[in-house]
Amino acid sequence: MEFEPVIGLEVHVQMSTNTKCFCSCKIEFGAEPNTNVCPVCLGMPGSLPVLNKKALEYAIKASLALNCEVHELSVFARKNYFYPDLPKGYQISQYDKPLATNGYIDIKVNDKTERIRIHRLHMEEDAGKTIHKGSYSYVDLNRAGTPLMEIVSEPDIRSAVGARLYLEKLRNIMRYIGVSDADMEKGQLRCDVNISLRPKGEEKFGTKVEIKNINSFRFVQKAIEYEIERQARILRKGGEIVQETRLFDEKTGKTFTMRTKEEAHDYRYFPDPDLIPVRITKEYIEEIRKSLPELPDQKAERYVKELKLTEYDAEVLVADKDRALFFEKAVSVYSENPKSIANWIINELLGKLNEEGIEISNSPVRPEHIAELVQLIDKGDISSKIGKEVFEEVFKTGKSPKTIVEEKGLKQVSDEGEIRKIVEEVLNNHPAEVEKYKAGNQKLMGFFVGQVMKATRGKANPKLVNKILQELLK
């Protein structure tokens, strides 16, 4: 029997505010344990939370970027559960009146656009961190109270690849709008996967399993692939899927049982009496909408329409904010040939950076270097082949292409008279080949071009060489 996976993601995004969600403690990754805490985030009796306005602004910004409807009224609620790293005995979250609902993200899976609907986006505070060492457990409350957005998708994803693409697109949007660095390694973006299987063609959902706290895009894909295989194996044998929470073991590539899945009523949600309902005016929402930068999809569309890039090239460039910024800086230096600039970035620079493990923001090849290189080729000062040599040298030394061309004497010979003399000399030295060419062996054109290039150490302008050869071999 063929099964179809039904996947929804719950993504927690840590907002890049300077201070926590309900107090003035600073947010500092890697600080000494329990140094950025106060009576509010420690849950001391009598301490009162106050909402961070910047966190609210960032959450509204994210909601609008994800095409959500932002509600003029939302309410903070207490989510009650007991954990050593939850000092108040409850988490401030939102329940039946979230900040925003009904959004979507479009992703491209196998060249087909799929719309993944977003059920809701709500604000909440993070818990602290429990570190287990031997027979001891240590609690660090520096993270407690950090502002989070929980972004819950509808179960519209149908493959492990689709889930990964959705997550990557979500991270990209968060970075573009500047509300989060969304670095999974630092825990700034955390993902829980809800997955069930159903027979293909059926509408009814199967029993849902949740996989908690997966901390990389690759592991999200691997965890889903394994879970699809595990559930399909059970169903084919006539077994039943248990509704539960599982964890993913990165070493074995398998999921394992964590606990039985809670229902919402287990958390006994109720409105937080210490926080007044959040009322947002339409004017404030519009003000934030106007402050949104150009988003990845809009940018890609502009690259295709205005700069005449292919859809593929545009998507590769906008898939990373720093990459798009690099491209735009290069085009601002030399705007005559954006297609060639895109080609050099995608086909040469990205591969080299990946090889060396360098981020594009730290690239030794700067945007102005790529612009200058393309300009040198367009003007006929160097050939594309020499351009690759120059690029390698720029990457090694950080020198400008012009400097390298001058230092190494790589400037292309574009003097027609000079090239004509060399072509005539080559033809005079190979009379037999000339006769064969004139008798119909057109393949010898490559031989003549090669001889001219050899004589000029690859510096002759290939277009001129071809033009003069065709004239003289008529």
Swiss-Prot record:
The protein's assembly and partners: Heterotrimer of A, B and C subunits.
NCBIfam families linked: gatB, PRK05477.1-2, PRK05477.1-4, PRK05477.1-5
Phylogenetic placement of the source organism: Bacteria, Pseudomonadati, Aquificota, Aquificia, Aquificales
Function: Allows the formation of correctly charged Asn-tRNA(Asn) or Gln-tRNA(Gln) through the transamidation of misacylated Asp-tRNA(Asn) or Glu-tRNA(Gln) in organisms which lack either or both of asparaginyl-tRNA or glutaminyl-tRNA synthetases. The reaction takes place in the presence of glutamine and ATP through an activated phospho-Asp-tRNA(Asn) or phospho-Glu-tRNA(Gln).
Record-given protein name: Aspartyl/glutamyl-tRNA(Asn/Gln) amidotransferase subunit B
GO biological process: glutaminyl-tRNAGln biosynthesis via transamidation; translation
Signal sequence range: none
Enzyme Commission designation: 6.3.5.-
Keyword ATP-binding attributed: yes
UniProt source species: Persephonella marina (strain DSM 14350 / EX-H1)
